[in-house]
Amino acid sequence: MGKGAGGTRLLGAPKPKSHAYFTSERKRLGTLDNNIDYYNWKTGGFVIWQEGHKHANEGRKNDEFRFAKELARHGYGVYLLPEDAKNGGISFRLSAKGGSTFSDAKVGTYYYEQTTKKSDNAKYGVLSALQHAGDKGIKLAAIYDKYGSLSRLSIQKGIDWYEHNRGKKGSGLIKLDGVLVVNKNHELYWHDMRTSENEWWEKK
């Protein structure tokens, strides 16, 4: 496992030369959609953050957020799930192929629905958001849990449910590359759906 200016990185990922590695590619969407904090126009990867959240400012400065941007640079869609998101949801829009402005190629609005039970949240809320976006051809490949609001066990239940139902007629589930979980101890857990292997990264 390597370390670069962008924080902990995935195995096999190229090492960034400087922090400009992210900032030079960053294009803030501003008021066009406040829920998307980072979008990489080259790869289509993105990081979703709930604006106005009490941890927003500190969240953008930590190693986990840099890790999320590293994933986005490689074309992953990454959710930042705030610990105080109890009701309602996170809505977001994405351009199918990018463009000079956000509204050039909108493909729809999708919702992450927060439920009261963590296991149900992992099983139905997050994965339903993935499948709805997948139906529109958007690549979503990772779930990013900033403050450990979803336990490793509940995520595993969601993975088990996903694997059990994937490929079933009418399920509508997309091919998911992997699931990323960050717990309160800043431990990074990546479940590779392609190899069914689990690996841990720890903040140094």
Task: Give the role of each language-model region.
Residues L94, S103-T116:
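Conserved catalytic cores of phosphodiester-cleaving nucleases, focusing on short active-site segments
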